[in-house]
Amino acid sequence: MIKSFFAALSFISRLPVPARLSQGLEIEQYQRSIVTFPLVGLLLGAIAGAVALLLQPWCGVPLAALFGVLALALLTGGFHLDGLADTCDGIFSARTRDRMLEIMRDSRLGTHGGLALIFVLVAKVLVIGELLLRDTHPIAALAAACAVGRGMAVLLMYRHRYAREKGLGNLFIGKVSLQQTLVTMAMGVALATVLLGLQGLRAALITLVLIWGLGWALKRTLGGQTGDTLGAAIELGELLFLLALL
């Protein structure tokens, strides 16, 4: 379990992980690490929340929220944001399925991807700022949001097919079991409830339903999921959870 956690941490974040703790795992062990995704999110969100908390007395709520979002982007290396941009470039191109997947594979940023990044990042700053004004603890809010966002992404893996022939997403999509799916989601919901009480539970359940709907819509449009759509689900899951806290 410990090796799985550090494997997941090295896979979906830029935090340094000693090689002895994350290397030498079989493919099946990487797939089993999905259940630790909410714990990785918990850690990343707690660090970003701590940044916002420490800066708030010095620079005020708006800038504290901005630097909290920036910290989260740096901690993940923009990994999930890149997936969000690629997904929106493809989906909103209104082309054929194959052409959408080609566009998503293109490393260049398009108009729709740029707009999606602006919207999501600005929305996160505004929502976190509003939560700070309402005296919601930033560490609890961001830790819970990141845990739930990564926990609910499993909904785009279980009983879905990979839309391409190869890629990083193929490691998880269609490869997770029902038990892994339930444990991963339950962990995200439980962490949100522990950190934020009934408000966190409500926000987590709302996020669950909306991310399930997102997965269904993407499946109909693309014929399956990709690593990019998983990244999009994580980013949107975080934002939806934070919005549901308001």
Curated annotation (Swiss-Prot):
E.C. no: 2.7.8.26
Pathway terms, separated by semicolons: Cofactor biosynthesis; adenosylcobalamin biosynthesis; adenosylcobalamin from cob(II)yrinate a,c-diamide: step 7/7
Alphabetized UniProt keyword annotations: Cell inner membrane, Cell membrane, Cobalamin biosynthesis, Magnesium, Membrane, Transferase, Transmembrane, Transmembrane helix
Keyword Transmembrane: yes
Cell compartment(s), UniProt: Cell inner membrane
Record field: transmembrane: 34-54, 59-79, 113-133, 138-158, 171-191, 194-214
Catalysis performed (reactions): alpha-ribazole + adenosylcob(III)inamide-GDP = adenosylcob(III)alamin + GMP + H(+); alpha-ribazole 5'-phosphate + adenosylcob(III)inamide-GDP = adenosylcob(III)alamin 5'-phosphate + GMP + H(+)
Membrane topology: Multi-pass membrane protein
GO BP, one annotated term: cobalamin biosynthetic process
Record carries keyword Membrane: yes
Disulfide bonds: none
Cross-referenced InterPro entries: CobS
One cellular-component annotation, GO: plasma membrane
Cofactor(s) essential for the protein: Mg(2+)
Family annotation (Pfam families): CobS
Domain of life: Bacteria
Enzyme category, top tier: transferase
HAMAP family named in the record: CobS
Stated role: Joins adenosylcobinamide-GDP and alpha-ribazole to generate adenosylcobalamin (Ado-cobalamin). Also synthesizes adenosylcobalamin 5'-phosphate from adenosylcobinamide-GDP and alpha-ribazole 5'-phosphate.
Name by which UniProt lists this protein: Adenosylcobinamide-GDP ribazoletransferase
